[in-house]
A protein has these predicted regions:
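Short secondary-structure boundary motifs at beta->alpha junctions and helix caps
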Residues: 170-187, 193-235, 292-312
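A structural micro-motif recognizing beta-strand termini
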Residues: 263-279, 324-329
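A structural "domain/chain start" motif
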Residues: 2-106, 110, 219-224, 251-267, ...
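A generic structural motif
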Residues: 74, 150, 196, 210, ...
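Short, structured interface segments
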Residues: 226-252
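Surface-exposed short loop/turn segments
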Residues: 123-196, 294, 301-302, 315, ...
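Beta-strand/loop-dominated core regions that host nucleotide or nucleotide-derived cofactor-binding catalytic loops
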Residues: 285-340
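N-terminal segment of the mature soluble domain
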Residues: 63-154, 199-203, 278-281, 286-302, ...
Length: 340
């Protein structure tokens, strides 16, 4: 059974570009009686609210395809993959997630062979995400860390006694797993970050487990791995992670970098027809500013400031577009084009 623990579910995009829900419509009917009074909680009581899924807070979704860089996952211990030779899990899981997201048609993504160390500080992870997004021209960066993939009792599979070997054979022939104790864990941590600000949009821990009864080294994503109970549990977990990521990404505004030269009326937008842009589209203009942090010593924060001007796309190519400011002004500094 797969499970997920959310530590930071709400998107941390700047408040001035986040969608603000309008007032709830007033019902046409008037209640005939007042609702019963609600008891006030005691002063020392703490009320725990359940986490709200991203789809519940998203009132409108951009039809444009966001861009995502997926890094290889890091592994907490190199020895966890020895059983079964599952050393390709670090690259295999991000690849499965990329395929899952692209099937949902919410992103265009690329996959890297490098990862972001989770033991790094928050400032370091922010800077790494910004650098990867800038280098690979993407809006988001996904990183992960494999925390556990050990067997509860490896001896039951790899060094069984006479009776344990007979029990293993019975379970393998009958495919009855309710009393099979050859359980293997998978726990991992996912972190989705905005590539322009480096802020975390989704931080969540996932866990699943299954029976691992494979001999030798079948390798990750092989036919034998597909047939295993452990493999099926992982594929189910990938589907859950893909749904969570797709919901979070769908609620974010579409943002693309702008290449503007001083005194040049035409600018280049770092997105094009592959993301769904069309000639004649208009986009909001935001300035990208780096300011000293008010809460962290010797640190900086990235802010997006909305400008009273709009961009109109003139020519759209597969990977980029050209545009001009509607009011004919010139740009000087770092700017972003945004469509919600």
């Amino acid at each position: 059974m797969a499970s997920a623990t959310q530590s930071q579910a709400e998107p941390l995009i700047p408040e001035d570009i986040a969608y603000q829900p309008g007032p709830r419509p007033v019902s046409d009917t008037t209640p005939t009686s007042l609702p019963p009074p609600v008891a006030e909680p005691e002063p020392d009581a703490i009320r725990m609210e359940p986490p709200v899924a991203p789809t519940d807070t998203c009132k409108r979704q951009s039809p444009l395809r966001k861009t995502l860089t997926l890094t290889s996952f890091t592994r907490l211990s190199p020895h966890m993959a020895n059983a079964g030779g599952l050393h390709e899990l670090e690259q295999g899981l991000p690849q499965l997630l990329r395929d899952e997201l692209m099937q949902r048609e919410v992103i265009s993504a690329n996959l890297l062979n490098q990862g972001i160390a989770q033991e790094a500080t928050e400032d370091q992870r922010q800077r790494q995400a910004q650098e990867l997004a800038r280098r690979h021209h993407t809006q988001f960066v996904l990183a992960g860390s494999i925390l556990d993939m050990t067997m509860d009792d490896p001896g039951r599979q790899y060094n069984p006694g006479l009776w344990q070997g007979a029990a293993n054979l019975f379970h393998d022939l009958t495919t009855i797993t309710s009393r099979d104790k050859r359980t293997r864990q998978l726990a991992l941590y996912l972190e989705l970050r905005d590539g322009f600000t480096g802020e975390a949009l989704l931080s969540r821990r996932y866990h699943t487990q299954g029976i691992w009864n494979q001999q030798g080294a079948p390798r990750f994503n092989s036919a034998a791995f597909h047939r295993s109970d452990y493999g099926k549990a992982i594929y189910e977990l990938v589907g859950q992670m893909g749904e969570d990521l797709a919901n979070t990404l769908a609620c974010q505004p579409f943002i693309a970098a702008i290449d503007a030269a001083p005194g040049r009326p035409q600018v280049i937008i770092d997105s094009g027809a592959n993301q769904g842009l069309r000639a004649g589209d208009q986009m909001e203009l935001y300035q990208l500013l780096v300011v000293p942090s008010q809460t962290r010593y010797m640190a900086s924060e990235t802010r997006l400031i909305k400008r009273n001007s709009r961009l109109q796309l003139q020519e759209v190519y597969p990977s980029h577009s050209t545009a001009v400011l509607v009011d004919g002004q010139y740009l000087n500094g770092a700017f972003l084009a945004i469509s919600d």
